[in-house]
């Protein structure tokens, strides 16, 4: 009940545009603490209890209330090691509290809680990222060229703040954000590593502005104006520029307008990569390439180079996307036809969208998480003394299950079998290390129970739909099946 009340208070503050007072609320940091604990399935978050203790949060709020927040980021205080530690702690706490404030209206739990109160309708944007692949399976077979785009980063932090002010109209929060960024500008590299979620939000906000303008020009439709940005004079000028731009294109540059209205153009993005695919010729794709480079530089003051956009033919190129390697391959098919007394064979080539999992990349991710070495040999993980055997097994099985669900759309399952073997043996080594015995003797004592934990999960969902004796169930398991409840990229699927 208290959590739901907190979400409703957030909604009230968000609708009225008053975000800055929420920084003084302790439940904000409790929400950030809870989301931090549930965010990763691989790493042990051992420092969360210290980082989000009520004593630290109250001390931080007291400093802000007393208008001593300049002391929090005072450079002279870095001479004291104890204060330097608190400095990093306070900055990280404020940054994650700020992110939870601006992120909370888009979280599924927030939407569900308000839906029960009939406050808002459920957002259509909260959909599975796996819905991209069924779309690609239907569309990409008819396309010819694809452009792999590395989205450039803004060259100055002020550009990020300018992009965010179109969505957040609370001037106090923006001033705090600007002061926060420029005060920590000297140690921005180390700070960004500790506060990845904070900088990821800023980056996504900047990309959102770029994409909203780009897709508006692409579709030549009315731009959906948000109520939170209509009061800014810069935004009004922006709408005027877009209107004038369309009029100029319609009157004088029909060729450029034709470029925007290409009905065979498809755009998909995740993280810092995006894909632009088209049925047109390579000349048309090169026009899009140089348009994007000029668009970034002139409209958003982001320096980019043509080398960040590579154009390839789909028949000779594979897409590295969302942890999969996708390609269009041709399957030869011989058809026998008979006319009266004569028969002949016809060779046809059928296009198929093939999706595989890169075993080398997955092993590299497992090695980075210390489940194995770079050659794929399983390693033992350090286990807590108070962890039971069932907790350790359940943790490894959960990782294996999440990987299996995420990569269930792969057309070849051999890579997943290797990953399951690594995780199973790593689990056995971890348990043997805990009991101070060998893996052989431990597996002999445990029997086939450990093996069943890792193997019985795969066919459970499919067997609920089809009988176990049905050949359809086995055929679906061998082929690709997409789980449409995937809302985030698996930690091990993110190879970058």
Curated annotation (Swiss-Prot):
The keyword Cell cycle does not apply. GO terms for biological process: mRNA processing; RNA splicing; tRNA processing. One of its GO terms (molecular function) is RNA binding. GO terms for cellular component: chloroplast. It holds the Pfam family Intron_maturas2. InterPro entries: Domain_X, Maturase_MatK, Maturase_MatK_N. It is found in: Plastid, Chloroplast. Its main location: plastid. It comes from the Eukaryota. Keywords: Chloroplast, mRNA processing, Plastid, RNA-binding, tRNA processing. Coiled coil: none annotated. PANTHER family: MATURASE K. Belongs to the intron maturase 2 family. MatK subfamily. Usually encoded in the trnK tRNA gene intron. Probably assists in splicing its own and other chloroplast group II introns. This is Maturase K. It comes from Paeonia lactiflora. The gene is matK.
